[in-house]
């Protein structure tokens, strides 16, 4: 009975998180344990910005483990091959931290630019789908 209850709770949790029952079937199929680590919780920047002004890119990273971890956060603009920021971050267990970088748009042309944030996986981490986020910013005059 306990296993059925656990599967039901897992199903409901997956449904709430993913909007479908996909994860239960996927976990059964894999037959391996998912090991969480670090993640990009949110990433925020204006959808539109003026060329020549600095644009703040806010990233919240999280630690899904109960123990302290250190990872490297890198924020880039793949469109221009610019590195906006990169630094090591140490997070206490089950915690998050906000990091804000300033992107210099001086000399860029009008258009849409991709901004990408990535945290390096920590030892033993197998769930890396949440380690990367990106967004687009339209630069105008």
PLM feature spans:
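Extracellular/luminal regions of secreted and cell-surface proteins that mediate adhesion/ECM remodeling
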Residues: 23-141
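Bacterial N-terminal signal peptides
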Residues: 9-18
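Positively charged n-region of N-terminal signal peptides that target proteins for export
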Residues: 1-5
């Amino acid at each position: 009975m306990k296993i059925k209850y656990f599967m039901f709770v897992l199903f409901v949790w997956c449904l709430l998180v993913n909007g479908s029952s996909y994860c239960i079937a996927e976990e059964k199929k894999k037959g391996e344990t998912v090991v969480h680590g670090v993640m990009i919780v949110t990433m925020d920047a204006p959808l539109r910005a003026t060329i020549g002004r600095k644009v703040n890119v806010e990233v919240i990273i999280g630690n899904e483990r109960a123990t302290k971890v250190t990872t490297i956060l890198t924020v880039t603009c793949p469109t221009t091959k610019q590195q906006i920021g990169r630094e090591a971050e140490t997070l206490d267990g089950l915690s998050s931290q906000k990091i804000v970088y300033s992107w210099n748009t001086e000399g860029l042309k009008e258009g849409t630019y991709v901004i990408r944030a990535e945290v390096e996986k920590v030892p033993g981490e197998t769930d890396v789908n949440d380690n990367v986020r990106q967004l687009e910013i339209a630069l105008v005059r």
